[in-house]
Amino acid sequence: MSVCYRPPGNETLLSWKTSRATGTAFLLLAALLGLPGNGFVVWSLAGWRPARGRPLAATLVLHLALADGAVLLLTPLFVAFLTRQAWPLGQAGCKAVYYVCALSMYASVLLTGLLSLQRCLAVTRPFLAPRLRSPALARRLLLAVWLAALLLAVPAAVYRHLWRDRVCQLCHPSPVHAAAHLSLETLTAFVLPFGLMLGCYSVTLARLRGARWGSGRHGARVGRLVSAIVLAFGLLWAPYHAVNLLQAVAALAPPEGALAKLGGAGQAARAGTTALAFFSSSVNPVLYVFTAGDLLPRAGPRFLTRLFEGSGEARGGGRSREGTMELRTTPQLKVVGQGRGNGDPGGGMEKDGPEWDL
């Protein structure tokens, strides 16, 4: 693609020094937090084989860590790009690297949406829990997620171009292509999944309050987790997609108008907003620690598997450890009592009925 539509002003990803500096700082911090964090998640869950099979939620979290870790491995390239102000890998590398980034973005978004939907169904439709534990279902869902991500990421490679042999950035043959691509990306990677997440967590919280969980310690933990997940996704991705929409609208505006010139400002701000979005790949392990609470000092490095063991999806029944979230199917909906301790290895288990993961 030799001819690229460019907004007025001739700005590039490297035009604003502030955007380059903040982008570099965000990338370094994201890698510092996310690489060891996601590596720990993979180490904890990849080799975990409970007797009844790995819970669906744990499998989704494992693949989420793989997707997030893959894109964080590319941070040295982007840091070099921003600091040296020149793309280091040529035209083929420009397309390939951004394709991997888009693949990771879509996989992470789809997996997060599935996690939200799984927890919502576990609360509102507990009779579906046996099906949600099926390994065959997990394989089909993961295959669908990765195939969808592979397809949705294709435009990221098609519309990337090495401009003047030094700037790897979006290159659309016409304003219509630019508006369509950027709008579709925001719709599929933010608006629809974020709407699903908000809807699922709203329904989940409403059901938990209806079960009189809202005022107890379990309800407080669930509320903090829900708020953290929704806020992290929205806050970290909103600036990136705001730039998308700004450039999409500017592409269709009259070339001499003020709105068209804002498209150039969005292009220059893209480096910083893209780097901020990298934090979405590093915050999930922090949220798992946040969720574990008192389970972390008691269970040590295995707190993540203990967290899923306590969810009720990994076993047929048992006492709820403090800090886990369960619903038990009995003639009446009730909260499972606390065990001997939060994550205490000595906590006994009793087989008294199925429990459903939230």
UniProtKB/Swiss-Prot annotation:
Membrane topology: Multi-pass membrane protein
GO BP: chemotaxis; keratinocyte migration; negative regulation of adenylate cyclase activity; neuropeptide signaling pathway
Residues covered by region (Disordered): 311-358
Sites carrying sugar chains: 10
Stretches with biased composition (Gly residues): 338-348
Function, in words: Low-affinity receptor for leukotrienes including leukotriene B4. Mediates chemotaxis of granulocytes and macrophages. The response is mediated via G-proteins that activate a phosphatidylinositol-calcium second messenger system. The rank order of affinities for the leukotrienes is LTB4 > 12-epi-LTB4 > LTB5 > LTB3.
Protein name: Leukotriene B4 receptor 2
